[in-house]
Amino acid sequence: RRLELYNTETGKIYRSFSAPDGTEFSVGFIHSVNLSPVTDVFVVRNGKIYADRTVYAAFGAGVESTLAPGETLSYDENGNMVVSGFGTVFPEVKYIVGTVYDHVLVIRGETISLTALCGRNAHVAFRLA
C-alpha cells in the first residue's frame, strides 16, 4: 500500500510513500488565525487513513475548545495540548499549502516542506493507493 500526495486540481502526484498498516504521518502548520503551531497526526489502519490526534501549542480562535464524546485532552512533554480519540476515517486528507507559513509533512523519519515540494497555495491531498 502507498500513501500518495497529489494536487487535487491537476492530479499530479508529488510523492508516494510506502504506507503499511501502522504508518503514522503528520502535517504541521502555523494556524492562520491564532498564529500558533498545530500538528495533525494520522495513522494508516486496515487500509484506511484515521485521524489519530491533533497537537496544539495554544488555545485561541479557530482551534478546538471543547471535546466531542470519546475525545481526550492530554499534554505532551513540551506542554502542548494533545486532543485524541477522534476515530475519524478520511478517504483523503486535504490541505491548501500555506501562502505565509509552510505546511510540513513528517513521514517515516523524513521531514518535507510542502511549500518547497508543491508550491504556495497548492491544493493537495493524501490518499492511499
Give the positions of each predicted feature.
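Mature, soluble, non-transmembrane domains
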Residues: G62-A129
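N-terminal secretory signal peptides
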Residues: Y6-Y56
